[in-house]
């Protein structure tokens, strides 16, 4: 009897204690709903919605390493050894729809290291040494508006502040910005575009017209012509020699990971440049590009260089993300 009463009493005590704990329990608040990042496919691959907004953001960039040998195809001087360079670039694109159209921003951050203090390689197209005959400045802050007609036609107007190149500063020195306007028509066959730019620092203008033709889905060619009212390379938009310059090129995309590129250029002062390369995608996101360039300094360019001919080569390793 005593043992049985003790067991029942212990059980009653446990029930009472459990009841007391249940009565005093703290009710946890409901967790807030988790808003997962949503993919935004309206502007191409890689965009996502910034949480809580209707703005689409893309973050992308690359890391590259260059090894150069032979002559400097810009100045005609002998490198006397290997030149090396590295760059990390991070780009941010934002886009959102408004009653006036798409509102977009673009920002690029670059961190460079070069053994020869050169920063102007690989600014255009599919080439590393693609500015043997330069066509204009490559970096600026700007405000631009682009009209897209929906039928392949587009137009752009921009106000630019200019920027620094390797040896020159093309930044505006007053309240008047550089002004740029352009038209473009694109279709399945290719595209044609023209642009006119006014340099407010030297008060001169330059214009360029380019056409691209897709011969097949793997082979394409292009041609560009330019004219400047100031016959000097020391300007923002017409950095070739003389009044005019012409460029042309071709691209072939091979079935197995390789793209072949060829480009040639000539300007009014007599400089001729040819560049060829093969961009080989070893794995997705990683490309190795060996390239060779030749520049002939003729006419008025002879007085500015040590040698009339320059041969140079470069191998680029680039990881894009």
Swiss-Prot record:
Taxonomic lineage: Bacteria, Pseudomonadati, Pseudomonadota, Alphaproteobacteria, Hyphomicrobiales
Record key words, sorted: Cell outer membrane, Ion transport, Membrane, Porin, Signal, Transmembrane, Transmembrane beta strand, Transport
Name of the protein this chain belongs to: Porin Omp2a
Listed InterPro entries: Porin_alphabac (IPR003684)
Statement: the UniProt record of this protein carries the keyword Ion transport: yes
Signal peptide: 1-22
Purpose of the protein: Forms passive diffusion pores that allow small molecular weight hydrophilic materials across the outer membrane.
Recorded GO CC terms: cell outer membrane; pore complex
Species this chain originates from: Brucella abortus biovar 1 (strain 9-941)
One Pfam match: Porin_2
Superkingdom in the source lineage: Bacteria
Subcellular location: Cell outer membrane
Quaternary structure annotation from Swiss-Prot or TrEMBL: Monomer.
Any GO BP: monoatomic ion transport
GO molecular function terms noted in the UniProt entry: porin activity
UniProt family annotation: Belongs to the alphaproteobacteria porin family.
UniProt remark on domains: Consists of 16-stranded beta-barrel sheets, with large surface-exposed loops, that form a transmembrane pore at the center of each barrel. The pore is partially ocluded by a peptide loop that folds into the pore lumen.
Disulfide bonds listed in the record: none
Topology class, membrane: Multi-pass membrane protein
Other remarks on this protein: The pore formed by Omp2a is larger than the one formed by Omp2b. Omp2b pores have optimal permeability to allow growth and protection against harmful compounds. The larger pore formed by Omp2a may be advantageous for intracellular growth, when the bacterium is competing with the host cell for nutrients whose concentration is particularly low within the phagosome.
């Amino acid at each position: 009897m005593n043992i049985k009463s003790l067991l029942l009493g212990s059980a009653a005590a446990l029930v009472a204690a459990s009841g007391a704990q249940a009565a005093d329990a703290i009710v946890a608040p409901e967790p807030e709903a988790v808003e997962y990042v949503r993919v935004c496919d309206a502007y191409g691959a890689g965009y996502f919605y910034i949480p809580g907004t209707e703005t689409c953001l893309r973050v992308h960039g690359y890391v590259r390493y260059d090894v150069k040998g032979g002559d400097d195809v810009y100045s005609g001087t002998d490198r006397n050894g290997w030149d090396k360079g590295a760059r990390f670039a991070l780009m941010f694109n934002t886009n959102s729809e408004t009653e006036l159209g798409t509102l977009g921003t673009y920002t690029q951050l670059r961190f460079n290291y070069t053994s020869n203090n050169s920063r102007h390689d690989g600014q255009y197209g599919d080439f590393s040494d693609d500015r043997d005959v330069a066509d204009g400045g490559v970096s600026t802050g700007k405000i631009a508006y682009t009209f897209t007609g929906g039928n392949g036609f587009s137009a752009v107007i921009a106000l630019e502040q200019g920027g620094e190149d390797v040896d020159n500063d093309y930044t505006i020195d007053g309240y008047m910005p550089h002004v740029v306007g352009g038209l473009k028509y694109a279709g399945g066959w290719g595209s044609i575009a023209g642009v006119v730019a006014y340099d407010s620092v030297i008060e001169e203008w330059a214009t360029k017209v380019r056409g691209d033709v897709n011969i097949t889905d793997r082979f394409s060619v292009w041609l560009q012509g330019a004219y400047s009212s100031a016959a000097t390379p020391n300007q923002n938009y017409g950095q070739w020699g003389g009044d005019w310059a012409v460029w042309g090129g071709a691209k072939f995309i091979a079935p197995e990971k390789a793209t072949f590129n060829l480009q040639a250029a000539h300007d009014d002062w007599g400089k001729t440049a040819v560049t060829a390369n093969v961009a080989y995608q070893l794995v997705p996101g990683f490309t190795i590009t060996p390239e060779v360039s030749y520049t002939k300094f003729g006419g008025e360019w002879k007085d500015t260089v040590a040698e009339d001919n320059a041969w140079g080569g470069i191998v680029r390793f680039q990881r894009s993300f």
